Regions:
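Intrinsically disordered, low-complexity polar regions and short flexible loop motifs
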Residues: 1-159
Length: 159
C-alpha cells in the first residue's frame, strides 16, 4: 500500500470495534517498510522495519534475521554449515542482508554464552530448513510462542 510521507497513525481494531493499538509511525518518501505488531512493556506496539534492497550478485539470494521476541534476549542464527552467521541479534533488531547462493539449507536458532563462536556451547532453540531461490530476499522473523524466552518460532518472508 502506498502511504504519503509523514506520521500516519496506524490503528489496530478488533471486529467488535475495540481499539487495541493506535500508534504514529514515521514514513519517508519513497521508502519501503514492513510493520510488525509486537509485544512491548506497555502492551502491543508497532515495529517499523526498513526494507532496503540487498546488493547481491546476479543469481544469488539474500537473507536477514529479525528478532521480534519480547524478552527472548540475543539470539544466534546459523544457516548451512556456518555459511552465514547472525550473532547476538538482540530483541527488536533486524540485521542487514547477507548474500548466499540459492538452495536448501538447514538453519539453527540458538542462545550461547560464547558470542564469537555461536555453535560452541550453545542451547539450540529451533532447527529447521530454508529454501532460497535466486534473485529473492528472505527475512527470518523470530517470535515467541509463549512467555518463555526459549519458546522460539520462525516466520520466513520471501520478497
Amino acid at each position: 500500500m502506498d502511504v504519503a510521507s509523514g506520521r500516519p497513525v496506524i490503528t489496530l481494531m478488533g471486529e467488535n470495534g475495540y481499539v487495541y493499538l493506535q500508534q504514529p509511525v514515521e514514513v519517508s518518501n519513497g521508502s519501503t517498510l514492513t510493520m510488525a505488531i509486537v509485544n512491548t512493556d506497555s502492551g502491543l506496539g508497532i515495529k517499523v522495519i526498513n526494507d532496503v534492497n540487498c546488493d547481491r550478485n546476479r543469481n544469488a539470494s539474500c537473507v536477514r534475521v529479525g528478532n521480534l521476541t519480547y524478552n527472548g534476549g540475543p539470539l544466534n542464527v546459523v544457516i548451512g554449515n556456518r555459511y552465514v552467521n547472525f550473532r547476538n541479534v538482540n530483541s527488536g533488531e533486524v540485521t542487514d542482508f547477507a548474500t548466499i547462493w540459492p538452495g536448501e539449507y538447514p538453519y539453527t536458532v540458538s542462545r550461547t554464552s560464547n558470542p564469537m563462536y555461536p555453535v560452541w556451547g550453545s542451547t539450540t532453540l529451533l532447527q529447521s530448513a530454508i529454501y532460497l531461490q535466486r534473485d529473492k530476499n528472505y527475512t527470518i522473523y523470530l517470535f515467541q510462542y509463549n512467555p518463555s524466552a526459549d519458546a522460539i518460532k520462525a516466520l520466513i518472508v520471501e520478497d
